[in-house]
Amino acid sequence: MALLCYNRACGQRFDPETNSDDACTYHPGVPVFHDALKGWSCCKRRTTDFSDFLSIVGCTKGRHNSEKPPEPVKPEVKTTEKKELSELKPKFQEHIIQAPKPVEAIKRPSPDEPMTNLELKISASLKQALDKLKLSSGNEEDKKEEDNDEIKIGTSCKNGGCSKTYRGLESLEEVCVYHSGVPIFHEGMKYWSCCRRKTSDFNTFLAQEGCTKGRHMWTKKDAGKKVVPCRHDWHQTGGEVTISVYAKNSLPELSRVEANSTLLNVHIVFEGEKEFDQNVKLWGVIDVKRSYVTMTATKIEINMRKAEPMQWASLELPAAKKQEKQKDDTTD
């Protein structure tokens, strides 16, 4: 009876009677996800694509392992005894201080003002990174022309959840059992969006059998630009608001950031084929002429000068409440 191997990155079924010391190729380390890069702690290869990460061939040989790893132990949470409400109250006398009336807001400019492209300042680190990418991409194109569409023996299937490798022409006729969705990691749980079988163990997640049948995908076709989400945050000082977009190797000639006094439109092309778009209705008012964009190898910083040195409650202006609108309609 064939057993499932639980070694990381293996997931093959094996016969215990024929199991040998070099039958399994696996990763003895743990998965590492850092700054959008994915890899294993036991080897140096890194990738930004999750399918490529799953297809990274193991770096160690050994025996197949049929023992399922134990679930991670959850910490025991002990609750203290409930205390009387009087004990939780502060031991000093409370004084309620009335807040001062808010300063009257300045008149907000119209959002229909013409948009202006902000100045792009390109760092030396980004220029060096793009020069290296151009050299490597040129070598890859030459290599692709030589290889044409030939599939090499041992190539892993690019479908999510499939661990099969190309063995020859017979592999073209095999049925592929894979996950058609995308991997989701949320609050310690791991699962595929297509079938939602949740687990907290990464090895169990990798060993989940696919829920869709089809053909193997041995090569990835170029689908052109792909709009993707990108991690971003913001901070402010007395006179500036800065938005940081963590997109690596952005392309200045294809990217743009435009704004007027109250609106900001961001379009960034990075890593050759990825796009990030974000439109922001700003909470406050900015001075467009004194605002600019700094592009580095690891991120883009949008530096916006405040029209007045005041604290912003948030980056975006909240949408008007529907209830207030309905109330106004009924009073008319």
Curated annotation (Swiss-Prot):
The gene is CHORDC1. Regulates centrosome duplication, probably by inhibiting the kinase activity of ROCK2. Proposed to act as co-chaperone for HSP90. May play a role in the regulation of NOD1 via a HSP90 chaperone complex. In vitro, has intrinsic chaperone activity. This function may be achieved by inhibiting association of ROCK2 with NPM1. Plays a role in ensuring the localization of the tyrosine kinase receptor EGFR to the plasma membrane, and thus ensures the subsequent regulation of EGFR activity and EGF-induced actin cytoskeleton remodeling. Involved in stress response. Prevents tumorigenesis. It comes from Macaca fascicularis. Residues 62-82 are annotated as: Disordered. The modification N-acetylalanine is found at residue 2. Keywords: Acetylation, Chaperone, Metal-binding, Phosphoprotein, Repeat, Stress response, Zinc. Residues 5-64, 157-216 form the CHORD domain. Residues 64-82 have a biased composition (Basic and acidic residues). Residues 2-77 are annotated as: Interaction with PPP5C. The modification Phosphoserine is found at residue 51. The keyword Cell membrane does not apply. This is Cysteine and histidine-rich domain-containing protein 1. It comes from the Eukaryota. The modification Phosphothreonine is found at residue 47.
